[in-house]
């Protein structure tokens, strides 16, 4: 991160720069060998291309001549006299800096140092702060050369920066929607669950239909000539296929579990009753969300620095070109891994904090005298003793997700070929990797709760949790999955609304933005934000069942060894289908505990 900030120059991407190494809108330092560099461009914030209608693809290491100007010419300028008048009135000089505006009509070199006539009308656009020609024929050539000639990384970064206001607005919308979903689950009812399921079904069908409609619109648009538009079209097809598959799978699951709605509502009410013992747990996602936002802003800033890292080289005529540093342009893979790992680590710290607080509240004999400051106590334990556990757990999730990313990249290459055999192999492998990714997630959650109970390391806690859950899987797994599925539908609902808002917002500027990447960024942010808020219920639910399993192993409900569990929770589990068989198995394998009031290790 430090090297990218030092070597990069995000200002060139944010504000644009001219052909002499000057960043527009900034005070610049001189470049040795470039006499027109090092100028004060504070008042000149726009990039103007002298031959906007006659650009050619870069050759001989030189790009089109660009200048920093204070304003773009909004009307066509047909003669040098009009160019001179525009400079005198607006203070915007459209000729090379070395030529004084008084000499625009007198100097014999004016034809070479001034823009080619006629100068088309243009307007500023936030894509590198460039002056974009407004005449259709000029705009078409201008955009095709500049956008198609730029590499993929710079097109992605420019799309993010051009839509930064929209992205920030959508992030605020995601925050409000996630907060509303949090309070919806806090006061859950059968009606609310049916409403959530209905909205998820409608949202998935609507978003899926919008993706296919936009893809059809792109394929039938005869003006689709830019690489950015073609990339958007490919991404649109990928989004449409993915959303269709997800919609079909979720609809099948919803149809299968439709008769379990009443049981799920009762389970979530039990979870809310446990949360009521420690109500400040619902504020924990706010801190997590704030930390995630800070980290994501920092991550994007470093990404901008990576994309602009380069050394200034003086070319013929005193022009300056920035050559990318060898190797640093490929560090974005390393940067992407850092995004996944650090985000998972932050979310893991929240899960361990919630799990520790719930364990403290669960194993408390006197329900009328709750433990003091369980959240602060759990945070203290996390930072003092369990940082390694959080790092290992988040690393495990990251390692299992990296192969999925690699396979998606390979599949995008293989699918261009006509051989069905490699495509089928990759699809099967990807499904296997998806299952491999989801298993460690649930194993990690149980490991965090076990670490909070026993104070053991990650590997020992994961082994103990797996053992105790396996003994009680007949009733724990079947009941737990229903609640987690409804919580997952809440996350899907947040993503659907945010993606729909992004589609409506980004589609307006689709010709000049690689807006498929910002849309994917918004969807990723929406899922992580919703996951940050709603994972409180998941963590409480998983921790409750693990504590319940430990309670069954160490106590038998007698007066000598009473249960720690709430009577309402025990009554709920008894009403599940498989509880009686699991109950007898639990007594058979119960561990001795002389007093029944001291928590012993999960596995002996």
Swiss-Prot record:
One of its GO terms (cellular component) is membrane. It is found in: Membrane. The chain crosses the membrane at residues 165-185, 195-215, 237-257, 286-306, 330-350, 485-505, 514-534. GO terms for biological process: transmembrane transport. It is a multi-pass membrane protein. Keywords: Glycoprotein, Membrane, Transmembrane, Transmembrane helix. One of its GO terms (molecular function) is transmembrane transporter activity. Residues 581-592 have a biased composition (Polar residues). Expressed in colon, kidney and ileum. Glycans are attached at residues 90, 103, 454, 472. The keyword Lyase does not apply. It holds the Pfam family Choline_transpo. Residues 581-604 are annotated as: Disordered. Belongs to the CTL (choline transporter-like) family. This is Choline transporter-like protein 3.
